[in-house]
Amino acid sequence: MISNGTGSSFCLDSPPCRITVSVVLTVLILITIAGNVVVCLAVGLNRRLRSLTNCFIVSLAITDLLLGLLVLPFSAFYQLSCRWSFGKVFCNIYTSLDVMLCTASILNLFMISLDRYCAVTDPLRYPVLITPVRVAVSLVLIWVISITLSFLSIHLGWNSRNETSSFNHTIPKCKVQVNLVYGLVDGLVTFYLPLLVMCITYYRIFKIARDQAKRIHHMGSWKAATIGEHKATVTLAAVMGAFIICWFPYFTVFVYRGLKGDDAINEAFEAVVLWLGYANSALNPILYATLNRDFRTAYQQLFRCRPASHNAQETSLRSNSSQLARNQSREPMRQEEKPLKLQVWSGTEVTAPRGATDR
């Protein structure tokens, strides 16, 4: 999440530097918007993706899309112009939107980790644990927390040291004030506590994936075990690595500002860590959708402008012609133990022996 509504602006005096930064920020904004639009379209056009699990992914995509449309363009303009040109009223609205949307984005990531944890650790009770009502309540809770830490806190001045406005009249800057209490509460609720829980849940998920791979290895399928464990490791490392790299520097700076004061951090460094946090919204469509096999298929259908039903029928027709021959050739092997696939994380499957999961 982000507690800073805008971030400090530092002037880019060198034209080459200004051009480079402009290109980088523009590309980041376009990727954020396009990537999350594709996620929303994929779910809207593909019935197979309309599941409770993907409710959180869609919520994440909508949140990041709104961030890309309502916040990032103004952040980029402010960063490049070195002054806030939209007045005091819009400054408070802008900073509140920034805090709210970044908070909601991180809390959606947090809920995705809990959802996957329940699916992997207790798959039989998953339909009982994750119900439509509980998903709806979770989504409402995400936005209640986000609004409380953004619009409510900023407009009531709970975040300020001695003033209620984020706007500086002397120097036209728009920056959220951070006092000690707001910095600590916001940092803990929206980053450090979710980070701790996510580390625990993903470690448990990885451990289960590794145990399943070991069972396969003991049955002689060492190659499948190695591939499965490698996929689980890479996927979980990518998910947690991106989250920590993008947000940990920002929240460290944010809490430090609450402890030492708003001017305790170099403006250039503060701007870098702020945009590093924004970059997480561009990575989310890749990490939480592209790594999922069903999403990859939906992307292919979307870019080919072909409906999912057409692809399914075509695949079915192609496969039916050779199904009888394959069934006859596989008949002697059906007595052997068949593997099951456990989706450890979106797009990552580890094969496990049926006996290991039927117990």
UniProtKB/Swiss-Prot annotation:
Q: Which SUPFAM superfamilies match?
A: Family A G protein-coupled receptor-like
Q: Where is the composition biased (Polar residues)?
A: 310-327
Residues in the Extracellular compartment per record = 1-22, 82-92, 160-180, 259-267
Cellular component aspect of the GO annotation = dendrite; plasma membrane; synapse
UniProt-annotated stretches for the region Disordered: 310-359
The record's listing under SMART domains reads: 7TM_GPCR_Srsx
Disulphide connectivity of cysteines: C91-C174
Could you tell me the superkingdom of the organism this chain comes from? Eukaryota
Question: Which regions face the Cytoplasmic side of the membrane?
Answer: 45-57, 115-134, 205-234, 290-359
Report how it sits in the membrane: Multi-pass membrane protein
Site, as annotated: Implicated in histamine binding: T190
Lipid attachment points (S-palmitoyl cysteine): C305
- GO biological process annotation, one example: positive regulation of vasoconstriction
Q: Which residues cross the membrane?
A: 23-44, 58-81, 93-114, 135-159, 181-204, 235-258, 268-289
Name the site position(s) for Essential for histamine binding.
D98
Q: Report whether Lipoprotein shows up as a keyword of the record.
A: yes
Q: Where in or outside the cell is it found?
A: Cell membrane
Quote the biased-composition stretches of kind Basic and acidic residues, using this chain's numbering.
328-340
Q: From the record, what ranges are coiled-coil?
A: none
Query: What would you give as a GO molecular function for this chain, any one?
Result: histamine receptor activity
Q: Where is this site: Essential for tiotidine binding and H2 selectivity?
A: D186
* Sugar-modified residues: N4
Q: What does this protein do?
A: The H2 subclass of histamine receptors mediates gastric acid secretion. The activity of this receptor is mediated by G proteins which activate adenylyl cyclase.
Family, similarity comment: Belongs to the G-protein coupled receptor 1 family.
Q: What is this protein called?
A: Histamine H2 receptor
